Each structure stands twice: as structure tokens, then as C-alpha cells.
Amino acid sequence: MNETATSPGSAAEAQREIAEEFAYFTEWSERYQYLIDLGRQLPPFPEASRTEAWRVHGCQSMVWLVPSGDASRMHFDAASDSAIVSGLIALVLRVYSDRPAAEIVATEPDFIQAIGLAKHLSPTRSNGLAAMLAKLKGYATAAAGSGE
């Protein structure tokens, strides 16, 4: 792995920090509560963006994901009507938002396995998380391809 992949402020660093934070909790009930707390800390999401155009399909709950920026730095705003999914959004945004499109596309969501999330999410939440990541990476791929 090259140095930039693990430099402070990188997606890899964000994933490492998430794994360290979740290591503090021994019970999954504590981890779920932490996820809910993270979701509550998301910035307000504009009602005008809660449209079909920004909706992530494949999620059981309602999820919206809005990209902005360009290939040099992409920002994402997102929201859900579910408390736990909002926490998942907070983790995803921490890893992927405000990064270059190329880094977003190249970054695998290793934190999901690292914190044991994969085996504790229901199949519908796992599918929704995969759909959200696919949509986010799709936006980044499009931005990187257009050179915006």
C-alpha cells in the first residue's frame, strides 16, 4: 500500500479510526446505540433533496444520497428515515465524503468487516448498505471519468 492510502485524513485512516472506536464496545447493543448516536449527529438534510432522483433503491428504509463537488473532491449528503441506517450513513460519509473521486472508487469498505458489522446486519440492511455504496461509487466513477 502506498503512503497516501494511510496518511491522516485518508479513507484508510478513517476506516482505522472507526475500527478503533468500535473496539471500545464489547456488546452489540452498545455498538447499535453508538450507530444510532452517530446517525443523530448527521447534519440536517434538506427536504427538497428527499426526492426520487436522489433515492437509493435497494434499501428497505428510505435513503437519499446527494453528491456535490468534482473529481478532485466529492462531497456527499445523505439521510434515512431509519435510526440505525442513519448511523451507517454517518460511517459511510466519514470514509468516503470529501475525498477525490479516484480514492472513493479505489477504497473498499473494509470497516464493515473490521467492526463485525457484516454478521450483525439483517439481510435487508446489508443489501441497503451495498446499494448505498454502489450508488456512491457510481457517482465517483462518473465524476472521475468526466474529469470534473
Predicted features along the sequence, with ranges:
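Extended low-complexity intrinsically disordered regions
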Residues: G9-A48
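Structural motif
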Residues: Y24-W28, A79-I84, T124
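Structured beta-strand/loop patches that form or line metal/cofactor-binding pockets in enzymes
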Residues: E47-S68
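Generic structural signal for hydrophobic core residues of well-folded globular domains
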Residues: G39, V95-Y96, L136, A140
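Amphipathic alpha-helical interface surfaces
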Residues: R31, S61, I84-I89, P100, ...
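Intrinsically disordered, low-complexity regions enriched in acidic/Ser/Thr/Pro/Gln residues
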Residues: N2-T6
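C-terminal binding/interaction regions
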Residues: S80, A102, T107, F111-E148
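Conserved interaction-surface patches within small, structured recognition/assembly domains
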Residues: V66-S82, L93-Y96
